[in-house]
């Protein structure tokens, strides 16, 4: 069992080097694969001897035991990547994960905010304080660009061009994209860079665009906490909140105003159009609600 766990660590190291996956993803893979190794060990199996039927039984057992479909899908992804790696490294002569059936995932619509709610959220920070001026600029950039939370906290000074009005983003899989900022975001970035950021840095030299109060790179958890703080001030229902609430609003509002789906896909940094298409369902649902509220025969 120790040898199998060691191979998992080798695999995760290789995955980090090749794919530049987030630490949270790697830790989730580590937990899932360690659980799988223990499950195999109790059945007298190892990574070298496990067969497709064994892996399928593991997935089925997880689902029947109350595992969420999304968790099972993540487990399947980890298992597939691991055995592809073992096959590529010639530890195995076959890949038993090649034909595993995927669990059916329920289609969940992203939590979205109305344009009026977003406006209230953006107006919540008190811009006469450097810290809240930073937060105002962050919220404006999030809504203007649709960036992921992890992408925003990773931005550096060299990633933005206020003259050109664009931001350079390094997204999932280390893929780079340029996203327009828009006039409002550019204005608040300029204001923050002049009146907010120098106060936050207090003489510390750091390239991070949005530093923490301690002049370090902000964590995703801190940003999420700040979003929730302003949402409460704006009177927004907590059930409508998620770390990517402004990303979802960005996509939905663009589609509501007639944006092309593939343009939205490019701006969001989605590799698969089907990932973007879920926002069309949000827009359609919004239209249906408006129809029911205002049409005399609805």
UniProtKB/Swiss-Prot annotation:
Activity regulation annotation text: FtsK may regulate the catalytic switch between XerC and XerD in the heterotetrameric complex during the two steps of the recombination process.
Subcellular location(s) per record: Cytoplasm
Q: Which residues form the active site?
A: 148, 172, 244, 247, 270, 279
- Please provide, in alphabetical order, the Gene Ontology terms of the cellular component aspect for this entry: cytoplasm
Q: Which InterPro entries match?
A: CB, DNA_brk_join_enz, Integrase-like_cat_sf, Integrase_catalytic, Integrase_recombinase_N, Integrase_SAM-like_N, Recomb_XerD, Tyrosine_recombinase_XerC/XerD
GO BP of this protein:
cell division; chromosome segregation; DNA transposition
Name the family the entry cites. Belongs to the 'phage' integrase family. XerD subfamily.
Q: How does it assemble?
A: Forms a cyclic heterotetrameric complex composed of two molecules of XerC and two molecules of XerD, in which XerC interacts with XerD via its C-terminal region, XerD interacts with XerC via its C-terminal region and so on.
Q: What is this protein called?
A: Tyrosine recombinase XerD
Its annotated function is as follows: Site-specific tyrosine recombinase, which acts by catalyzing the cutting and rejoining of the recombining DNA molecules. Binds cooperatively to specific DNA consensus sequences that are separated from XerC binding sites by a short central region, forming the heterotetrameric XerC-XerD complex that recombines DNA substrates. The complex is essential to convert dimers of the bacterial chromosome into monomers to permit their segregation at cell division. It also contributes to the segregational stability of plasmids. In the complex XerD specifically exchanges the bottom DNA strands.
Describe the location of the Tyr recombinase domain by residue ranges. Answer: 108-292
GO MF annotations for this entry? Answer: DNA binding; tyrosine-based site-specific recombinase activity
Domain Core-binding (CB) stretches: 2-87
């Amino acid at each position: 069992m120790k040898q199998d766990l060691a191979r998992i660590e080798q695999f995760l190291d290789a995955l980090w080097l090749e794919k530049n996956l987030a630490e949270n993803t790697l830790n989730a893979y580590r937990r899932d694969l360690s659980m799988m190794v223990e499950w195999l060990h109790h059945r007298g199996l190892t990574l070298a001897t496990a067969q497709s039927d064994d892996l399928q039984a593991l997935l089925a057992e997880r689902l029947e035991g109350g595992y969420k479909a999304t968790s099972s899908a993540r487990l399947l992804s980890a298992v597939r990547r691991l055995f592809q790696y073992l096959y590529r490294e010639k530890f195995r002569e076959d890949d038993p994960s090649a034909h595993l059936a995927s669990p059916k995932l329920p289609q969940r619509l992203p939590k979205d905010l109305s344009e009026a709610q977003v406006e209230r959220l953006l107006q919540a920070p008190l811009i006469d304080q450097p810290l809240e001026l930073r937060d105002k600029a962050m919220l404006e950039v999030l809504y203007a660009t649709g960036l992921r939370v992890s992408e925003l906290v990773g931005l550096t000074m060299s990633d933005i061009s206020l003259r050109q009005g664009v931001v350079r983003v390094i997204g999932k899989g280390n893929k780079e994209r340029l996203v327009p900022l828009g006039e409002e975001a550019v204005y608040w970035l300029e204001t923050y860079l002049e009146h907010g950021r120098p106060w936050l840095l207090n003489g510390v030299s750091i390239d991070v665009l949005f530093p923490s109060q301690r002049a370090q790179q902000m964590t995703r958890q801190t940003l999420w906490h700040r979003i929730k703080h302003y949402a409460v001030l704006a009177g927004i229902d907590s059930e409508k909140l998620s770390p990517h609430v402004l990303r979802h609003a960005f996509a939905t509002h663009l589609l509501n105003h007639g944006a092309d789906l593939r343009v939205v896909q490019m701006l969001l940094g989605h590799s698969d159009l089907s990932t973007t298409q879920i926002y069309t369902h949000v827009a359609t649902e919004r239209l249906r609600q408006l129809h029911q509220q205002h049409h005399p025969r609805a």
